[in-house]
């Protein structure tokens, strides 16, 4: 049984297990799920990503956790924390992010998972502030950010996205420990 970090009324956020690999590969290869990312991920890239997630959780006690529905024990995506690997006026920082499979969109799972993760970040991990960002075109993800109570900080050009790409401009949000 993988280590559970967070439980919500409908979800379990936990360490990754081998049975997550195939659905994660499908998730990362879904063009609609990956619409606001520069490219879909290959099988090898997805497996490498899982390996990094597992190592981060083991070594730091946090990272991107696998998200599982309680009602059917189905892997539906991930949510959790990372340290963006690019230079910007707000980095270094802790970022919260998520990605869920399309059949699980529109049911409040992303907000439930992200909200509980934010609480875990402040109460258990003692983070002082947590950022989130997404493409200005990703209105669904931005709505999740807003629903978790994060405060808009402005816009920035994502340095890892090619200049001229419609995905380059991002909206930035932040939540600080005192405004939870």
Which residues make up each language-model segment?
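Conserved GNAT-fold acetyl-CoA-binding loop/helix
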Residues: 32-53, 63
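Acyl-donor (CoA/ACP) binding surface of acyl/acetyltransferases
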Residues: 1-35, 51, 68-180
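Short loop/turn motifs at secondary-structure junctions and domain boundaries
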Residues: 56-60
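Glycine-centered flexibility motif
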Residues: 61-63, 80
């Amino acid at each position: 049984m993988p280590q559970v970090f967070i439980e919500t009324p409908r979800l379990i956020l936990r360490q990754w297990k081998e049975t997550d690999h195939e659905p994660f590969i499908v998730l990362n290869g879904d063009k609609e799920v990956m619409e606001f990312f520069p490219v879909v991920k290959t099988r090898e890239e997805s497996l490498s990503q899982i390996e990094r997630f597992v190592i981060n959780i083991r070594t730091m006690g946090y990272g991107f956790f696998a998200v599982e529905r309680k009602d059917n024990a189905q892997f539906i995506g991930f949510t959790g924390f990372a340290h963006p690997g690019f230079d910007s006026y707000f980095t270094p920082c802790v970022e919260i992010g998520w990605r869920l499979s399309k059949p699980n969109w529109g049911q409040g799972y992303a907000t439930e998972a992200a909200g509980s993760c934010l609480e875990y970040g402040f109460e258990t991990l003692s983070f002082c502030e947590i950022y989130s960002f997404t493409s200005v075109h990703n209105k669904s993800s931005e709505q999740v950010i807003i629903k978790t109570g994060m405060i808009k900080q402005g816009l920035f050009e994502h340095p890892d996205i090619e200049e001229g790409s419609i995905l380059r401009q991002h909206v930035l949000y932040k939540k600080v420990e005192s405004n939870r």
